[in-house]
Amino acid sequence: MEDTSRCIDDVLKIGQQEKEIRQAEFSDAQGEREEVKCIDYTVDLEAGLPRHESSGKSNTLKQCYNAVLGFLEELIIVIIIVLLLYSLTMVGLFYVMTMTKFLF
């Protein structure tokens, strides 16, 4: 009998949670992003991340660290691309110089 009442309570809780989810409030924060609030859990719809990992303006040390690492990764990629283009240009110039030397 206790198991049956527990199951009924669980089903009622799940039903209540589904009802609260259906009645989620959409709010527009300064016209920049939308958030869904439901059962003390907020999701940033723009980024699809939970609030504590949201793309909002939160100055935590971890976010600053991640931003710096991201910047360094992008910088390294740009430097590698520039060096590849430079080396290809130098190889091309060397080829043109040697060909003109042989032809003329």
UniProtKB/Swiss-Prot annotation:
The membrane-spanning stretches of this chain are: 76-96
Compartmental location: Vacuole membrane
- Output the superkingdom of the source species: Eukaryota
**What triggers its expression?**
Regulated by phosphate levels.
List the keywords (alphabetical): Membrane, Transmembrane, Transmembrane helix, Vacuole
Membrane topology is: Single-pass membrane protein
Q: Name the principal localization, coarsely classed.
A: membrane
Quote the cellular component terms of the Gene Ontology held in the record: fungal-type vacuole; vacuolar membrane
- What are the recorded Gene Ontology BP terms? phosphate ion transport
The answer to whether the entry has keyword Transcription regulation is no
State what protein this is by name.
Answer: Phosphate metabolism protein 6
UniProt organism field: Saccharomyces cerevisiae (strain ATCC 204508 / S288c)
